[in-house]
Amino acid sequence: MKNILSIQSHVVFGHAGNSAAEFPMRRMGVNVWPLNTVQFSNHTQYGHWTGCVMPASHLTDIVQGIADIDRLKDCDAVLSGYIGSPEQGSHILAAVAQVKQANPDAWYFCDPVMGHPEKGCIVAPGVAEFFCNEALPASDMIAPNLLELEQLSGERVENVEQAVQVARSLCARGPKVVLVKHLSRAGYHADCFEMLLVTADDAWHICRPLVDFGKRQPVGVGDLTSGLLLVNLLKGEPLDKALEHVTAAVYEVMLKTQEMGEYELQVVAAQETIVTPICQFTAVRL
């Protein structure tokens, strides 16, 4: 069984970061070692929260503890998401290096959460620069949304073709796989949710219907998406099939959340369809 060290945020109430991704990843049949970068009462889109950012040294201490019992060699991938400070980022990269020393075949999957003030996603100063300058070249896989893709590349992206080109430019700087996990205004269709999966040689596009939640969209969709893609790839799924499963599984969670009249992702209620989605979508090679 594969093992993932998941270094992300944690909320006590609701679903974001590890609280959104950990259970679905486990449900897909992998072990998850959750290491929390922050512990908040709830996610920041509520506009009010309590809790704390973990000291950067806490991350290193925990990873060293696993090394001390000689189990880092069993780690197949490190997944990082929301970080509370750029100092945490440096410690995460040190942890990645330590894992790869113990297991040279281990992957680093970076979800570069850079903040989106309009959506209430707030990150500390210096975090975006950390992702652009340090995490990108260290990653094997990276999963930006459109805004983050533009920040990582320093280029404006207006359409799918440009998104593919810019994603390939990121591949030249480090990662082998780039998931653009929300094309937004650069997509083909205004009424669809679209994603791209890009490598140096291939590009796959997929779309699904939007799920309308009104003015306030659920948080944690990107965390769920990244976690499920990593699981699929670790299990050896081809890129297109991995993208298809992730798209369908996340859509099922969104539908269940809407059906239940909830705002927080209903990952437990949707667990069966995360594993075996009812809806199906086809990835198209570009």
Swiss-Prot record:
Gene Ontology CC annotations of this record: cytosol
InterPro entries associated with the record: PM/HMP-P_kinase-1, PyrdxlKinase, Pyridoxal_kinase_PdxY, Ribokinase-like
Domain of life: Bacteria
Keyword Cell division on entry: no
Pathway: Cofactor metabolism; pyridoxal 5'-phosphate salvage; pyridoxal 5'-phosphate from pyridoxal: step 1/1
EC number(s) per entry: 2.7.1.35
Entry annotated with the keyword Transcription: no
Recorded catalytic activity of this chain's protein: pyridoxal + ATP = pyridoxal 5'-phosphate + ADP + H(+)
Signal peptide interval: none
Cofactor(s), by name: Mg(2+)
Residues that, per the record, bind substrate: 9, 44-45, 223
Entry keywords, A to Z: ATP-binding, Kinase, Magnesium, Nucleotide-binding, Transferase
Molecular function GO terms recorded: ATP binding; magnesium ion binding; pyridoxal kinase activity
SUPFAM superfamilies noted in UniProt: Ribokinase-like (SSF53613)
GO biological process per UniProt: pyridoxal 5'-phosphate salvage
Its biological purpose: Pyridoxal kinase involved in the salvage pathway of pyridoxal 5'-phosphate (PLP). Catalyzes the phosphorylation of pyridoxal to PLP.
Family statement drawn from the similarity comment of this UniProt entry: Belongs to the pyridoxine kinase family. PdxY subfamily.
Subunit (UniProt): Homodimer.
PANTHER family: PYRIDOXAL KINASE (PTHR10534:SF2)
HAMAP family, alphabetized: PdxY
Protein's recorded name: Pyridoxal kinase PdxY
Organism, scientific name: Yersinia pestis
Gene name of the encoded protein: pdxY
